[in-house]
Amino acid sequence: MTMVTRVIMTDDDSQSLCFLCFLLFFFITAIAVAGDSLDSDREVLLSLKSYLESRNPQNRGLYTEWKMENQDVVCQWPGIICTPQRSRVTGINLTDSTISGPLFKNFSALTELTYLDLSRNTIEGEIPDDLSRCHNLKHLNLSHNILEGELSLPGLSNLEVLDLSLNRITGDIQSSFPLFCNSLVVANLSTNNFTGRIDDIFNGCRNLKYVDFSSNRFSGEVWTGFGRLVEFSVADNHLSGNISASMFRGNCTLQMLDLSGNAFGGEFPGQVSNCQNLNVLNLWGNKFTGNIPAEIGSISSLKGLYLGNNTFSRDIPETLLNLTNLVFLDLSRNKFGGDIQEIFGRFTQVKYLVLHANSYVGGINSSNILKLPNLSRLDLGYNNFSGQLPTEISQIQSLKFLILAYNNFSGDIPQEYGNMPGLQALDLSFNKLTGSIPASFGKLTSLLWLMLANNSLSGEIPREIGNCTSLLWFNVANNQLSGRFHPELTRMGSNPSPTFEVNRQNKDKIIAGSGECLAMKRWIPAEFPPFNFVYAILTKKSCRSLWDHVLKGYGLFPVCSAGSTVRTLKISAYLQLSGNKFSGEIPASISQMDRLSTLHLGFNEFEGKLPPEIGQLPLAFLNLTRNNFSGEIPQEIGNLKCLQNLDLSFNNFSGNFPTSLNDLNELSKFNISYNPFISGAIPTTGQVATFDKDSFLGNPLLRFPSFFNQSGNNTRKISNQVLGNRPRTLLLIWISLALALAFIACLVVSGIVLMVVKASREAEIDLLDGSKTRHDMTSSSGGSSPWLSGKIKVIRLDKSTFTYADILKATSNFSEERVVGRGGYGTVYRGVLPDGREVAVKKLQREGTEAEKEFRAEMEVLSANAFGDWAHPNLVRLYGWCLDGSEKILVHEYMGGGSLEELITDKTKLQWKKRIDIATDVARGLVFLHHECYPSIVHRDVKASNVLLDKHGNARVTDFGLARLLNVGDSHVSTVIAGTIGYVAPEYGQTWQATTRGDVYSYGVLTMELATGRRAVDGGEECLVEWARRVMTGNMTAKGSPITLSGTKPGNGAEQMTELLKIGVKCTADHPQARPNMKEVLAMLVKISGKAELFNGLSSQGYIEM
């Protein structure tokens, strides 16, 4: 009998079963989720590290410090960002980490990844599909790489910031871009090779605010909805069509619109006036016609109006005069013709007026532009102006850049042009000017450029030009100038630092495409190294940044120091005197022109011996062709280790062929032809042997290597036509010598053994760009002095001389008796140099890769920002440094006033007025580091012990051992723990990023210490920051408690110290963006200082009591 059991389930049983199933599902899910933990994230990061190290065996970045430790350490790895609970990895920042090769293909395993920054590397290949599986990614920056292929990121629907600029990505994005733009706020695809249409790809991107699609190959019409964005740039594409009124609806939110460099046409609509927040309107380089819209005059916020290179009507609307905030007006290349319009003389608010290439004729006085009171740059080049140069220009005392080149001006240059003390660039080239160069130009001490080429100027270069200590770029080629090159002229360009400092203070924001490209192309000698490198990369965007670099004194390219192949980024000068009638000898003092990288003296009548001191210059280009130089070619030319172009042809040099030329390993162009008295053998190996026979023509006494095809070469008749104006008798002597040499050679040719001159290859060039992990010597703007061993060299940043032996003597061989301080990065010794200067010698104690990075970072700061011979008054001056293996030494100015840390709690020695002065001094130093250095510098350890006082009590910031250059934004991934307990910003422990805002936080703590006389951390229940916030938030100061003042007069200084404490509280806000920047802080301090002046006659013993 078979029993069948039937189970009947009630409703309660069903619910219980469902609940059990839910628990089972939850348990399985929990197990799966548990697999995604910090442990698994660590394994992915270690896999990423191995991947990167295998493809970058030499130049490794921050990832080398990712070590196998417990899981908590993962969140402290440099470049790694975790959740606040440190439970998962959410971000990776490996910008500028010398990464090359294809992109890692397993980022998606980091399931909580929201931030990925791999910018400024050399990552190549296509963007892998794996990246599309990082579904939580919000910030992706792959800019400044060499990525290729097409763009496909369909899975990144949460992406808010996308930066793929400066790559080689191709293809049409019309179908791919809308798939991931739903949450996108920032989209930067500039400077790639994208193609196709973009007129409808943004319609579904509801959150988009900032778009930069410039410098691609997009075609068709523009997207009509750009009016709802904040910034929109499609500059330098192939877009066309008309810009319609409907694109500027009433709710236009644009602040920047850049349509330049396309083929838009028709009339531009006046409805642009609906964009009342517009700061920049750039229509340069299109095909717009008709009248300039009068409605533009109602956009009161407009600062930059770029309408050049179109065909607008020459009638300028009167309404534009209402733009009271207008700084830059560009109406160049519109072919206006006729006389210059009178209205330009009424733009009294404008600083930059660019009107070049408009086919203007007549004079320029009629428009009254020479009476504009605020004019800083006036560009009237490439027109047809004629007549005398107007003397009235000299009355514009604000003028810095005057460009009148490529016109038909004639007559003398007015002496009055020497009365513009702020003038930095004067370009009068390619006119019909006659007469002499005014001696009054010697008063132009701010002059950086003087361009007088291709005129008919005569006479000597006035000795007074040597007083132009900022004059780095001097071009008088192709005139009729004569006379000697006087020794006094070698002083030109000897100290441009004051001019660069003025430019660093100028904060006018000028966008790309405002005439600087044309200026740079005129002023950079495109055919001569090293400037040809810069000329080759001039695009509209690069011109803006390069122009800014030049004006502020930052180097555009690495320049060699004399006698070394080691390069550093520093400003470089040129001297162009070719095509004149200069005569006499070159003075030995030319060695003083220590920034000179290009020297062109060709096609003149210089004579005598070439001074050996020329070998002390950092030259990359030297052209002496077609002069009358004689004597031996100095062996010292072999010290020009980075010389690329050398032309000594058509002179009267004699003696043996200089073997030192074979040491010029970078020489790419060489010509020593037609110096018939040079003798000896041409090297058969080395750099010189790489040139063909055309480099040696007309030298019958030279012995050629066997591999030269000499048929008739060294016995060739030399005609008068080739030799120019050489005397006929001298010609006969040359031919006789050539024939005699040929006869002797036939008799002894079987016994001659060609000499082999081996080239001693110099060490591999170090460009200070992170391409090496170690280098024996790095140079800056000074010279080098060898120690007794000849290996350790001291690099001096001022003009004084001292050696490593002097350092040893000053510190008694680094004796313990000379120790005046110890820190986390080394020991400081006090000593006296032979010239009597007291110095503080800092010997770095850390070794290995990290110590090397720290030292190199500091050297980059020194090279780029000149903390030596010209030092900021609130930064401790550095006299020099040396590096040889483990020896890493800095030689600082000794500060006799000691450390602020020793005085900050002493309420009798440090009075309240002095405390405000110290706070102001430190702020000025940090303003320089953050806002006036390029790139910006983060100190990373602002504290009382890093503030030193000189003998007058002035404060200076010291210890840049961990300084880093910031290439993008204001953050930099730290490689070691930076900062000191009590001073470190709270976000540092989460982001591991050292930022300028972090410096502001540390500075805020320092101001609290100054205001209270209390330490940041003193063992109390409340740290200083917490106490200050409580006090200031509760407004307890208004009741006089708990803050009171000690001293005989309790009221003195209370208000100022309270204000100082308020600044400290503002600087220590929890959120970085809520903190002021250092410029804003300095402005607050200046106000307090102004109030403090009212108390100068009273007792100043006022301090806050706890």
Swiss-Prot record:
InterPro entries reported for this sequence: Kinase-like_dom_sf, Leu-rich_rpt, Leu-rich_rpt_typical-subtyp, LRR_dom_sf, LRR_N_plant-typ, Plant_LRR-RLKs, Prot_kinase_dom, Protein_kinase_ATP_BS
Modification Phosphotyrosine, positions: Y983
Enzyme Commission number, as recorded: 2.7.11.1
A Pfam family this chain is assigned to: LRR_6
Keywords (A to Z) from UniProt: ATP-binding, Glycoprotein, Kinase, Leucine-rich repeat, Membrane, Mitochondrion, Nucleotide-binding, Phosphoprotein, Receptor, Repeat, Serine/threonine-protein kinase, Signal, Transferase, Transmembrane, Transmembrane helix
Cytoplasmic compartment spans: 758-1106
Residues forming the catalytic site: D941
Recorded GO MF terms: ATP binding; protein serine kinase activity; protein serine/threonine kinase activity
GO cellular component, one term: plasma membrane
Segments passing through the bilayer: 737-757
Sites bearing Phosphothreonine, chain numbering: T803, T811, T991
Domain of life according to the entry: Eukaryota
Catalyzed reactions: L-seryl-[protein] + ATP = O-phospho-L-seryl-[protein] + ADP + H(+); L-threonyl-[protein] + ATP = O-phospho-L-threonyl-[protein] + ADP + H(+)
Residues on Extracellular side: 35-736
Signal peptide (residue range): 1-34
Residues annotated to bind ATP: V820, G821, R822, G823, G824, Y825, G826, T827, V828, K842
Residues of this chain annotated as glycosylated in UniProt: 93, 106, 141, 188, 193, 242, 251, 309, 322, 365, 374, 384, 408, 454, 467, 623, 628, 652, 671, 709, 713
Family designation: Belongs to the protein kinase superfamily. Ser/Thr protein kinase family.
Name of this chain's protein: Probable LRR receptor-like serine/threonine-protein kinase At1g74360
